[in-house]
A protein has these predicted regions:
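Rossmann-like S-adenosyl-L-methionine
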Residues: 1-72
Length: 72
C-alpha cells in the first residue's frame, strides 16, 4: 500500500489499518511526523529510504521509504 499523509502524519485509525499490510510505501514531507509514525509502526522495518530535495533553498524535503513487516 502507498501512503502520503498530510504534514500532521497518520491517525491511530490509519496506523491500525496499515498493520494489515505486509509492505508499505510511505511518503512524507515532515520528518517529525514521519519519525512519530514509524515509532507506532515498530513491527515494520525500513528496507529502503530516500530523501529528495524537491524545493532547493528551502527547509522542505520529501522522504520515501519502503517498510516491510517483520517476521511476516
Amino acid at each position: 500500500i502507498l501512503i502520503d499523509p498530510p504534514r500532521s502524519g497518520l491517525t491511530n485509525d490509519i496506523i491500525d489499518l496499515l498493520r494489515l499490510f505486509k509492505n508499505i510505501i510511505y511518503i512524507s514531507c515532515n520528518p517529525d511526523s514521519y519519525l512519530r509514525d514509524l515509532t507506532m509502526l515498530s513491527d515494520y522495518e525500513i528496507k529502503k529510504i530516500e530523501v529528495f530535495d524537491q524545493f532547493p533553498n528551502t527547509d522542505h524535503l520529501e522522504i520515501v521509504s519502503i517498510l516491510t513487516k517483520k517476521n511476516y
